[in-house]
Amino acid sequence: LAAGLAPDGGLYVPEHRPRLQHWSAHDSFAQTAAAVLAPYFHDDALVQVLPELCAQAFNFDAPLRPLATADDHVLELFHGPTAAFKDFGARFLAACLARLQQGRERRLTIVVATSGDTGAAGA
């Protein structure tokens, strides 16, 4: 979770994509996010607190908007506290790292960089 890049310098990509069933039957984006993320955390220490982490990270509205020409929807990614799409990923990553750090005496410093105006999402 904290490594960033894979050992070969690329991105981490799941070996398998689990089939997600009934993912849209939840009352909030945070609940849906926890259901979608759960298969990727199945053997991780955070799996038990995943719903709590999602509720903490996604404590804002994330509306789905229907597309005019198809039976599809678009998730609007500008409704977070900084109005940037990175509110979704950065806030979840920060919540996970903070939880992993709980109970440890050693201080953790997270250094991030941005090339645009979305850096506030990681703060």
Regions inferred by a protein language model and the residue ranges of each:
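PLP-dependent amino-acid enzyme catalytic core
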Residues: 1-123
